[in-house]
A protein has these predicted regions:
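Conserved GTPase G-domain substructure that encodes guanine base recognition and part of the catalytic core
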Residues: 1-12, 17-212, 238, 242, ...
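Periodic glycine anchor positions in long extracellular repeat architectures
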Residues: 210, 214, 218-237, 241, ...
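C-terminal or otherwise distal, non-catalytic regulatory regions appended to signaling enzyme catalytic cores
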Residues: 227, 252-253
């Protein structure tokens, strides 16, 4: 499996396989990732702004993941790796084989929360011991939906908050076109921060940088998180904006 390119308007995502498919495949995958990380855009800047590594929270063996992070990504990502690498542990709900997940409140109970926090600490420690970097992983659950059942995501707002935060300020606003307006998706989190508020704050930083279509864009940002946000967004967009140039033409990803 090669690195695949996905385009959402001017947002470009590169999806790469991990390691663990055998020595020859691992060498091939590593070379592809290294090549992409070292690629520059037309302005001589790194093509890749940030790297998101998703780990399987239900797996006990993360050896190949550590090799990917410590030996492939970190040595080749360039400057400020701690601000450009995001590690997310998925399937938090089944990390202990489904035990201690409170389905009613859609969150981990204390036993599972302690287990997940220890896994976060372990991943952080292993990376630090190998590279000297302090990268703080997070855990989340993507949720699921089928014709019989549904489970909302958990900590997805935290993941999005960090993705937006790690994206250069002048490029953040492009996310506004692709964030779901379904409030249930963003409702459940560890509540360490008000992540929805922080996401809006980060997006408005882009508006303040001059990337704006005035009240219309401000309103679109606000709509992502409810009626109050929409009103505030329109006011902020109207005050800050007024530049009626298309957002798409302002990004070159």
């Amino acid at each position: 499996m090669d690195i695949k390119k996905f385009e959402l308007d001017n947002l470009i995502l590169w999806d790469s396989p991990g390691l663990g498919d055998g020595r020859d495949k691992d060498i091939q995958h590593s070379k592809g990732i290294i090549s992409k990380l070292n690629e520059l855009d037309e302005n001589g800047k790194p093509l890749i702004d940030m790297v998101l590594v998703i780990l399987d929270g239900s797996s006990r063996d993360l050896g190949t993941s550590y090799e990917l992070i410590n030996s492939v990504i970190i040595p080749n990502i360039g400057e400020n790796p701690e601000k450009r690498i995001l590690i997310a542990i998925n399937q938090a709900d089944v990390a202990m084989k489904g035990k201690y997940w409170n389905e009613k409140e859609n969150k981990p109970e204390k036993e599972l929360e302690d287990f997940l926090n220890e896994k976060v600490a372990s991943v952080k420690r292993r990376i630090n011991e190998a590279t000297g970097l302090n990268i703080e992983p997070i855990y989340y659950s993507a949720g699921y939906k089928d014709k019989y059942d549904k489970q909302n995501p958990y900590n997805l707002s935290k993941l999005l908050y960090l993705i937006v935060k790690y994206t250069p300020v002048n490029k953040r606003l492009i996310y506004a076109n692709h964030i779901s307006s379904d409030e249930e998706i963003w409702k459940y989190s560890d509540e360490i921060k008000d992540y929805n508020r922080e996401i809006k704050k980060s997006l408005f930083e882009s508006v303040k940088e001059g990337i704006s279509e005035g009240a219309e864009i401000g309103g679109e940002i606000g709509k992502l998180f409810g009626k109050t946000g929409e009103t505030i967004g329109k006011i902020a967009g109207g005050v800050i904006g007024g530049i009626a140039s298309g957002i798409k033409s302002l990004f070159s990803w």
